[in-house]
Amino acid sequence: GIWGTALKWGVKLLPKLVGMAQTKKQ
Protein backbone atom coordinates (compact mmCIF):
# COMPACT_ATOMS: atom_id res chain seq x y z
CA GLY A 1 0.00 0.00 0.00
CA ILE A 2 0.93 3.65 -0.15
CA TRP A 3 1.82 3.74 3.55
CA GLY A 4 4.29 0.89 3.14
CA THR A 5 5.95 2.72 0.26
CA ALA A 6 6.03 5.99 2.20
CA LEU A 7 7.54 4.18 5.17
CA LYS A 8 10.28 2.66 3.01
CA TRP A 9 11.13 6.07 1.55
CA GLY A 10 11.08 7.63 5.01
CA VAL A 11 13.56 5.05 6.28
CA LYS A 12 15.79 5.66 3.26
CA LEU A 13 15.70 9.46 3.40
CA LEU A 14 15.72 10.04 7.16
CA PRO A 15 19.43 9.17 7.64
CA LYS A 16 20.33 11.47 4.74
CA LEU A 17 18.36 14.36 6.25
CA VAL A 18 19.92 13.76 9.65
CA GLY A 19 23.38 13.62 8.10
CA MET A 20 22.78 16.87 6.23
CA ALA A 21 21.54 18.58 9.40
CA GLN A 22 24.60 17.42 11.33
CA THR A 23 26.91 18.61 8.55
CA LYS A 24 25.31 22.06 8.54
CA LYS A 25 25.77 22.39 12.31
CA GLN A 26 29.51 21.77 12.13
Curated annotation (Swiss-Prot):
Subcellular location: Secreted; Target cell membrane
Record bears the keyword Cytoplasm: no
GO molecular function: toxin activity
Keywords noted in UniProt: Antibiotic, Antimicrobial, Cytolysis, Fungicide, Hemolysis, Membrane, Secreted, Target cell membrane, Target membrane, Toxin
Organism superkingdom: Eukaryota
Tissue specificity field: Expressed by the venom gland.
Pfam families: Antimicrobial_4
Positions of disulphide bridges: none
Biological process per Gene Ontology, one example term: killing of cells of another organism
GO cellular component: extracellular region; membrane; other organism cell membrane
Described function: Has a broad spectrum of activity against both Gram-positive and Gram-negative bacteria and S.cerevisiae. Has insecticidal and hemolytic activities. May act by disrupting the integrity of the bacterial cell membrane.
Family: Belongs to the non-disulfide-bridged peptide (NDBP) superfamily. Medium-length antimicrobial peptide (group 3) family. Ponericin-W subfamily.
Name of the protein described by the UniProt record: M-poneritoxin-Ng1d
